[in-house]
């Protein structure tokens, strides 16, 4: 029977850190020890940054990005091309495309992809808002930058069908994105090439 080596507050910190993507119990324990050892240099500023995030970060009412501004920095950037809307499943995908400087269009975050097995249906996504945006006369192209997974492609087909009446060109990323691949894990060169080689969907 294992005995406790730390108080409940430290155990709680470890449990919370273990919930983060990529951190298991062992990594969370190491991270907690590091934070505690670097209390002034790291833990206190991190706690402050987390509190600011809680207080100030919100979801952009226009595109679904997260930012401290609403509408977000991307939506209010006058250098952006308002005729192009790049559709992504998640904010992480938007950030991946931005790191690659792959487009100067605006974005629309669906919030997920259709996944019947996970109970994610059309009503769980922001598809209605996308269709409404597509009817704006200033919009001429919708780029589907969705993961090359079964769920991503199912979502792309579903969205394409709904966008037919809007009369906009619907394109998707080129097949340089590997099947089964997720945008957030691709390098910038691959993302840039895929954006340049997009095709009609």
Swiss-Prot record:
Transmembrane segments: none annotated. GO terms for biological process: DNA recombination; DNA repair. It holds the Pfam family RecR_HhH. Residues 83-178 form the Toprim domain. This is Recombination protein RecR. The lineage of its organism: Bacteria, Pseudomonadati, Pseudomonadota, Alphaproteobacteria, Hyphomicrobiales. GO terms for molecular function: DNA binding; zinc ion binding. May play a role in DNA repair. It seems to be involved in an RecBC-independent recombinational process of DNA repair. It may act with RecF and RecO. InterPro entries: DNA_Rcmb_RecR, Rcmb_RecR, Rcmb_RecR_Znf, TOPRIM_dom, TOPRIM_RecR. Belongs to the RecR family. A zinc finger (C4-type) spans 60-75. The keyword Zinc-finger applies. Keywords: DNA damage, DNA recombination, DNA repair, Metal-binding, Zinc, Zinc-finger. Gene3D superfamilies: 3.40.1360.10, 6.10.250.240, RecR Domain 1.
